[in-house]
Amino acid sequence: LVGSEMCIRDRSRPWLYYVYAALAAAVFEETGRLIAMKFWMKKWLDFPNALMYGIGHGGVEAILIGGLSGISNLVSMLMINSGAMQNTLAALPAESANQTVSQLSALWTTPAPLFFVSGIERISAIILHIGLSLLIYRAVKAGKCRTAAFTAVLAYGIHFIVDFFAVAGPALLPIYVIEIGVFVMAAGTLVTVSYTHLRAHETRH
């Protein structure tokens, strides 16, 4: 945590923060996925359950990140429109009130389409989590250690690349390009893993 705080504060090296953020997400989430499927889900681990794991992971994340943020924005807008926000700001010290207004200004300065972009981002995240869950499932079920290791590393790598592109991309590209890129990578992962699984299933039968 200390390292992350230093990294976040050091804006002179933003790329170091981008690498850290993407790597941390990939390592913690994929390791958790791997442990869950290797040990906790050992008796029930099959393709449908791996699929549901990905849906659950992505769905809960969408609720916590997108849903709660949306509710917070909605409540703030209702308070502003009803005049309740003015009363709240009046009760705050001047410095705190100015900071609050600065934060709330994003609600009326942000272009409306960008609020829909966050929903598309969550859809892409759910698709990605499904694909990565199926990839880790294949790693756990792989008969050969080399194949299992390669598949697991592939999941870590894909997660890192997608997250790095998502956090570093806005510094170079328009947000719409970033979201399209993330969606393509997420969908590509899911389609490829599903196709590989179906081909392997057909070969066995």
Model feature map: region roles:
Residues R122-Y195:
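Functionally important transmembrane alpha-helices
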Residues A112-I126:
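A loop-to-helix transmembrane entry motif
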Residues W40-P48, K141-C145:
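Juxtamembrane helix-boundary/capping and inter-helix hinge elements in multi-pass membrane proteins
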Residues A22, R33-W40, Y53-G54, I65-S69, ...:
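Generic transmembrane alpha-helix signature in multi-pass membrane proteins
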Residues I55-N98:
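Transmembrane alpha-helix/helix-exit interface in multi-pass inner-membrane proteins
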Residues L1-D10, T196-T203:
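Conserved small/polar residues in nucleotide/adenosyl-binding loops
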Residues P93-F116:
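Membrane-helix boundary elements
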Residues S4-E5, R9-F28:
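Transmembrane alpha-helical insertion/packing segments
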